[in-house]
């Protein structure tokens, strides 16, 4: 979403046809008609089940700075989804609060991993106690290694910034020379078979109207990124990346 918001803030996106936009609920496409969401990815805390149980985990992502979690939390600092999430964190709470939280996490010996999957795999084998990831990676790992993977997802309180639902957005450039093909691709992503694939095989939340999520996925009550102004998200993406780098988490 960050790069899409960045392109939108530069007036580089084209207008998507109403026949495509109408395939999703109103909150899952831009009011200006320049992007459309096709799947949802919830932010969660993945944890090692040998070390923790749900009742011992915090209500809020803010609580991860507590000394009892020192050295136990992994952060995918350079991952696009994390930077998107941190951009919304800044938008919702202000730069000072968001920066302080990240600095406190570093002071609490949070560990850097390059992406969501590496954190999920590390939590499953007990290398790290827990980490901030997209929900679907752990579902995929459990499906692939049901007998050996020892990690589960944990959701913070429903309205906590740590439970943000990130919409995966698709768009087209205003400068596109293949406008019709671009529209066809956007429509294809929202067809029932493709949406069913996203939820049945990759465990994402489908956004096309009428498509039922995988029964294994918990019902969504989380804060949604669709409620956040994509112009702000795009404009803040670079600043969020700068703050992440300045925090020192990438050297942990």
Regions inferred by a protein language model and the residue ranges of each:
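A ligand-binding cleft/hinge motif common to bilobed small-molecule-binding domains
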Residues: 2-7, 129-151
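A bilobed periplasmic-binding-protein/Venus flytrap-type ligand-binding module shared by bacterial periplasmic
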Residues: 44-51, 166-178, 197
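Extracytoplasmic ligand-binding site segments that recognize negatively charged/polar headgroups
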Residues: 1-128
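Short amphipathic alpha-helical coupling segments at ligand-binding clamshell hinges
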Residues: 97, 101, 168, 177-189, ...
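Short, catalytically relevant binding-site loops at active-site mouths
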Residues: 80-81, 119, 136-140, 158-163
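Periplasmic-binding protein-like
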Residues: 23-26, 41, 69-78, 102-106, 112-113, 188-212, ...
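An extracytoplasmic/periplasmic, membrane-proximal ligand-sensing/linker region
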Residues: 96, 204-252
């Amino acid at each position: 979403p960050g790069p899409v918001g960045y392109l939108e803030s530069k007036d580089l996106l084209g207008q998507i046809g109403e026949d495509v936009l109408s395939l999703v609920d109103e909150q899952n496409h831009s009011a200006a008609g320049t992007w459309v969401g096709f799947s949802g990815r919830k932010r969660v805390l993945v944890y090692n089940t040998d070390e923790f149980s749900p009742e011992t985990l915090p209500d809020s992502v803010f609580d991860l700075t507590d000394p009892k979690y020192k050295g136990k939390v992994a952060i995918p600092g350079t991952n696009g989804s994390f930077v998107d999430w941190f951009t919304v964190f800044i938008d919702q709470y202000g730069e000072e609060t968001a920066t302080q939280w990240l600095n406190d996490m570093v002071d609490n010996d949070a560990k850097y991993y390059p992406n969501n999957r590496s954190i999920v795999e590390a939590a499953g084998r007990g290398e790290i106690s827990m980490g901030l990831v997209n929900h679907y990676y752990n579902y995929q790992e459990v499906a692939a290694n049901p007998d050996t993977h020892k990690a589960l997802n944990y959701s913070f309180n429903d309205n906590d910034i740590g439970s943000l639902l990130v919409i995966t957005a698709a768009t087209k450039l205003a400068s596109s020379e293949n406008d019709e093909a671009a529209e066809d691709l956007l429509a294809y992503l929202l067809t029932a078979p493709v949406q069913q694939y996203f939820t049945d095989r990759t465990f994402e939340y489908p956004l096309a109207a009428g498509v039922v999520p995988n029964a294994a996925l918990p019902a969504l009550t989380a804060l949604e990124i669709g409620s956040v102004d994509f112009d702000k998200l795009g404009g803040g993406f670079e600043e969020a990346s700068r703050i992440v780098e300045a925090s020192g988490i990438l050297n942990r």
